[in-house]
Amino acid sequence: TVSEEQMRKEIAVMKRLNFNAVRTSHYPNAVKWYDLCDELGIYLVDEANLETHGYGGQLSASAEWTAAYLERATRMVLRDKNHPSIVLWSLGNESGAGANHAAMHGWIREYDKIRSV
């Protein structure tokens, strides 16, 4: 577990190096990370817990996986929607492209008409 002190140090280094945004790749980070980004002025690209490396678009194109894909999108958005630092919702990492990604995108667009997807 990364301490709040360490998170603050990492954000301070990023700001010194003129970074203004980070991506929460592969999975959601600790809630405190989102809070600190809100407080300290770092933009976030929040990424759904979705990575299907090696499967290409097979799972994203399969109706058997639609509910699982949508659950990951809805969990992310409902959990993190009140963080002003989030500027973009990411549908996942190296997870192909297909109907299930389109369903995720559609749900997020309907729910959050402000942020990019």
What are these regions (language model features)?
Residues 83, 111-112:
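Acidic-histidine catalytic/liganding microenvironments
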